[in-house]
Amino acid sequence: MALKIRQIKGTVGRKQNQRDTLRSLGLKRIGQEVIREDNSVTRGMVHTVRHLVEVEEVAGE
């Protein structure tokens, strides 16, 4: 199982740790999508920026 993560809000005025988390996920701009492995590390990062991203589960990698 994998997660498709899309950035839906920008980082202006956000805390540094939230900006760093988006970068770690591979997101740089609004509308960008990445696919990441569904594990506890990724889930924790998504939780940190849950108000800035949209997440859906997809089959495969």
UniProtKB/Swiss-Prot annotation:
<protein>
    <recommendedName>
        <fullName>Large ribosomal subunit protein uL30</fullName>
    </recommendedName>
</protein>
<comment type="similarity">
    <text>Belongs to the universal ribosomal protein uL30 family.</text>
</comment>
<dbReference type="GO" id="GO:0022625">
    <property type="term" value="C:cytosolic large ribosomal subunit"/>
</dbReference>
<keyword id="KW-0687">Ribonucleoprotein</keyword>
<dbReference type="InterPro" id="IPR036919">
    <property type="entry name" value="Ribo_uL30_ferredoxin-like_sf"/>
</dbReference>
<dbReference type="GO" id="GO:0006412">
    <property type="term" value="P:translation"/>
</dbReference>
<dbReference type="InterPro" id="IPR018038">
    <property type="entry name" value="Ribosomal_uL30_CS"/>
</dbReference>
<dbReference type="Pfam" id="PF00327">
    <property type="entry name" value="Ribosomal_L30"/>
</dbReference>
<comment type="subunit">
    <text>Part of the 50S ribosomal subunit.</text>
</comment>
<keyword id="KW-0689">Ribosomal protein</keyword>
<dbReference type="GO" id="GO:0003735">
    <property type="term" value="F:structural constituent of ribosome"/>
</dbReference>
<dbReference type="InterPro" id="IPR016082">
    <property type="entry name" value="Ribosomal_uL30_ferredoxin-like"/>
</dbReference>
<dbReference type="InterPro" id="IPR005996">
    <property type="entry name" value="Ribosomal_uL30_bac-type"/>
</dbReference>
